[in-house]
A protein has these predicted regions:
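Catalytic domains that recognize anionic headgroups
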Residues: 1-172
C-alpha cells in the first residue's frame, strides 16, 4: 500500500510521507490513498470517482462517489469475524443480517467481482477515476496458475507467504 500512496500522489514515498512525521493518525497512509492528489485533481475536473473493495483496510476508498463491493455489509472483515464468534451474532441473525466473514471463498469472490465490475464500468457515461487494488498477486493465493479456484488447507490469513510455490513469475 505504500507504493499505492506514492503513485496516487505523484511523488516519491519519502516526500509523500514527510507531512506525516508528526501525525497522530493510526493509519497515516490511509488518508493519502483515500484523499490522494490524483483523485482530487480528477474530481475537480468533473470526473466521478469509482472504487472497488480491496478487502484491505489500507486501500479501501469508501468515500468515492461510487463504492463497489461484492459483500455489502455494515461490518468490515475483522468486525465480522469478531461478531461471528460471540453472542452478538444473535441479533444479526434475528435482523436477517450476516456478519461478513473473511476467508478464501470471499477473497476469490472479491477478485472475480472486481474484474467483472471493471469490465462494466466503460459503459457508464462520463469521465471516471477508477481505483481498483486487486489483491491477487499477493498471498493468500486463491487461484492456481491456470486460474482455477483453490482452497488452501490452512486458516485464511492475508499475509500468508507460505502460499508461494515455485517462483514469482508463475504468479504474474
Amino acid at each position: 500500500f505504500l507504493s499505492v500512496a506514492a503513485t496516487l500522489n505523484f511523488d516519491y514515498l519519502n516526500e509523500v510521507a514527510a507531512p506525516l512525521a508528526n501525525s497522530s493518525a493510526r493509519v497515516p497512509f490511509l488518508d493519502l490513498i483515500q484523499h490522494s492528489r490524483s483523485r482530487a485533481l480528477l474530481e475537480n475536473a468533473g470526473y466521478r470517482s469509482f472504487a472497488l473493495s480491496s478487502g484491505l483496510l489500507f486501500t479501501e476508498i469508501e468515500t468515492a462517489d461510487v463504492y463497489l463491493s461484492p459483500h455489502p455489509s455494515p461490518f468490515n472483515e475483522l468486525e465480522g469475524l469478531l461478531l461471528s464468534n460471540t453472542l452478538l451474532q444473535l441479533p444479526l441473525e434475528i435482523m436477517g443480517q450476516e456478519a461478513y466473514l473473511p476467508g478464501y471463498r470471499a477473497h476469490q469472490e472479491r477478485i472475480l467481482y472486481a474484474f467483472e465490475a471493471l469490465s462494466q464500468l466503460p459503459a457508464v457515461a462520463g469521465p471516471k477515476f477508477v481505483f481498483a487494488h486487486i489483491i491477487a498477486p499477493h498471498p493468500p493465493f486463491v487461484f492456481d496458475r491456470t486460474g482455477a479456484s483453490i482452497q488452501p488447507d490452512r486458516t485464511y490469513f492475508l499475509g500468508d507467504a507460505d502460499g508461494y510455490r515455485g517462483n514469482t513469475v508463475e504468479y504474474l
